[in-house]
Amino acid sequence: HQQAGSCRFLWQRDAQDSFFGASPERLLSLRNGQIRSDALAGTAGRLETGESLLNSEKDRREHELVVQAITDHLRSLGLTPRRPRRPQLARHGQLMHLHTPITAAAENQLPLFLAGALHPTPAVAGLPRRQAIGWLRSLETFERGGYAAPIGWIDSAGDSENSARSSE
């Protein structure tokens, strides 16, 4: 199963139109008052070794920017994020990514508010967020559509899961 551990989704708009995917990039999972967000930045093909990715200064720096942005956003909401010191390797299909799971206790938090605070991560939009989004809009001659949009679900207990991005 190539997408084990991915944020999997299916959205059926009507009988003729469905949107499904399996993104390795989980923007937010909220279960029983516990948040998890997956920082995923720094990518290499399967032909490279995991050690080369873990030791790549460029990829580690990019990855740490994403980790720091997510933890800063969670702190700004009054939460106390926890994370491992070093990233792990996550394999998805033909790619390997640097991956850091970030967790926090989040009693009485609204999933849509949390997702809105975290989206877009620097892995999607860049840094600083507002300037990067403006720069991308001025350069890109196409609409990203659903590519950079989070997608997910919320249940009646307030638990949820949202992918950071997908493709149409």
Language-model region placement:
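An anion-binding catalytic pocket shared by soluble metabolic enzymes
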Residues: 1-60, 65, 81, 158-168
